[in-house]
A protein has these predicted regions:
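GGW-centered surface loops in extracellular recognition modules
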Residues: 3-114, 136-141
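Register-specific beta-strand positions within repetitive beta-rich fiber domains
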Residues: 117-118
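Short carbohydrate-recognition loop motifs
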Residues: 124-137
Length: 141
């Protein structure tokens, strides 16, 4: 006769139930939680557990409007980004420093801004959001 699971206990014929310990999802630990003394830190993933700021500020090509984007589940909120950009392209104007030193990287010249959305499609590398710099502009802090 096989064992059955009932309310967290394994029950089988002729034996008492025993507790089952199910693994829980690991807590998020950011890279900067382990290495807290960074002078500056930029990523499309959240790097510090306590960081509550935005990830990037993006300009959309259709009307040059700009908007900040944060994180969902510790990665860039790509759904909101794609909704904002629509069928056009999106360019990063500010990449926010997650180190806590406020050394945000900005680039105000539109033709030098790196792209993150191309014609409504998220730029990716190995299936991860990626910032592409087709014009070789430099983001400055």
């Amino acid at each position: 006769m096989g064992a059955s699971i009932y309310l967290g206990k394994v029950l089988s014929a002729g034996t008492k139930g025993c507790n089952i310990i199910l693994p829980t999802a690991p807590s998020f630990v950011g890279l900067l939680d382990t290495y807290p003394n960074a002078a500056a830190a930029y990523s499309l993933r959240k790097l510090r557990t306590a960081y509550t700021g935005n990830c990037i500020r993006v300009r959309r090509s259709s009307d040059n409007a700009e908007q900040d984007f944060g994180f969902v589940n510790n990665v860039l909120d790509t759904a909101s980004l794609l909704t904002f950009v629509g069928a056009g392209s999106g360019f990063v104007t500010t990449w926010y420093d997650q180190s806590g030193t406020a050394r945000n990287a900005t680039i105000s010249t539109a033709v030098e801004q790196p792209r993150i959305v191309n014609a409504g499609v998220l730029d990716t590398l190995n299936s991860k959001p990626s910032i592409i710099n087709p014009n070789a502009g430099v983001i400055r802090r």
